[in-house]
C-alpha cells in the first residue's frame, strides 16, 4: 500500500534535525501514545541495531521491536518492525535547504500479521494518517526550541 507521509521545514541544520528525529529516547516527546524508546544494544545506531518502542494501546503498554535497516547520517534513516501483529516500516529523510534549515519527511507503512491483517486497513492506517501531521509538527517545535 501507499505509505503515510508527513513533511515539514525545520529551522535547524540537517545534522540537528537528524540527530533528534532518529534518537529513540526522544520519540515519546513527539509521538502520540509512545511511552518509551531505546536502542539495543545501547550506543551509536548502526544497521542491525534494534529499536524498541513501547506504546500505550487500549490501556496497556505494548513493546514493539524494529531493526535499523539503513542509516546515512544526516540524510536518511529507516527501521522495519520484526514482531507483533502490526509491523511498521519507517523511513526518515532530512534534506538541507540552507545551512540553518532542513526539510524533514517521515514515511510510515504497515504490514499486518494475524489479527493485524484486519487492524491495519480498518484502524492503524487511519490512525497514522490522523496522527502523523501532528507528530511531525510536535517534533518541529521540539527541535526548534533547542
Each predicted region: which residue ranges?
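Short, surface-exposed coil-to-beta transition loops
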Residues: 3-5, 61-65, 87-91
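A short, compositionally biased micro-patch
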Residues: 30, 71-72, 97
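Amphipathic alpha-helical segments that line or abut small-molecule/effector binding pockets
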Residues: 15-18, 133, 137
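Hydrophobic ligand-binding cavity/cleft-lining segments
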Residues: 1-46
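Beta-strand/loop substructures that line and gate deep hydrophobic ligand-binding cavities in soluble
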Residues: 80-134
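Glycine-rich portal/gate segments that line the openings of hydrophobic small-molecule binding cavities
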Residues: 38-85, 103, 110, 134-146
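Generic structural detector for well-ordered beta-strands
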Residues: 7-11, 38, 67, 93, ...
Amino acid at each position: 500500500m501507499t505509505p503515510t507521509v508527513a513533511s515539514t521545514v525545520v529551522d535547524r541544520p540537517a545534522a540537528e534535525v537528524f540527530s533528534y528525529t532518529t534518537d529513540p529516547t526522544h520519540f515519546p516527546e513527539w509521538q502520540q501514545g509512545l511511552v518509551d524508546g531505546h536502542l539495543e544494544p545501547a550506543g551509536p545506531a548502526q544497521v542491525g541495531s534494534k529499536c524498541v518502542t513501547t506504546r500505550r494501546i487500549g490501556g496497556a503498554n505494548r513493546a514493539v521491536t524494529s531493526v535499523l535497516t539503513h542509516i546515512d547520517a544526516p540524510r536518511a534513516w529507516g527501521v522495519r518492525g520484526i514482531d507483533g501483529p502490526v509491523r511498521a516500516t519507517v523511513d526518515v529523510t532530512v534534506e538541507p535547504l540552507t545551512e540553518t534549515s532542513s526539510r524533514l519527511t517521515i514515511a510510515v507503512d504497515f504490514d499486518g500479521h494475524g489479527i493485524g491483517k484486519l487492524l491495519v486497513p480498518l484502524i492503524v492506517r487511519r490512525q497514522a494518517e490522523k496522527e502523523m501531521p501532528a507528530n511531525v509538527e510536535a517534533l518541529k517545535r521540539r527541535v526548534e526550541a533547542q
